[in-house]
Amino acid sequence: NQIDEKFLFAAEHIIDHAETVLMKKLNEHVLIALTDHIAFAAENIRNGIVIRNKLLREIEALYHEEFSIAQWAVDYLNHTLAIPYTYDEAGYIAIHIHSGHSGQTSNHRSIREVTIVSEIIQLIEKELRIDIHSEQMALNYSRLANHLRLLIQRYHNQQYAVLDEEIIEIVKRKYSGSYAVAKKIRVLLTKQYQMSITSEELGYLVIHIERLRG
């Protein structure tokens, strides 16, 4: 089942553009993965199958530069291949680009990162009864999403946030409602993803959650 050359050429052009913008070389695995992806997406479009990207907002917040390149890529694909790719595809393409310049040989880690952030945000929305994705919360949403991304990266790199013990105790007492939500996040991370987070990380989470109550 050979892939049409037009998809290969398109993927090469997108990678060239990404490397120019990011001023970084992308991993060689990206070419095959991206070619496969845009060919598969084209087949879905031909068959009338619409796949919505439920992680689009998180991908845009976490990988902003890659997402901007991916939006350019969708316009380029629509124009060059005359196939109506949707902006949902920008999310998937951004993941490929991010994985390609962050030393990963597959998308697994990037997708896991975005999924964890999305699940935590859903939990916070449910507990606080708010819509974090609303326009008036855009700045706090972006801060929270990036804080969560760094938390996950610190865990993987075995690095630890530093926060004075006294401050942790004050935060727990003063923001007891947000602390209760942060503890639920810790349970989610432990049960679903086998990630244990420190009391310092928990303290920072409480501060971010409290900011959302604003």
What do these predicted ranges mean?
Residues 1-214:
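A cross-family "folded-core" feature that marks the main globular domain of proteins
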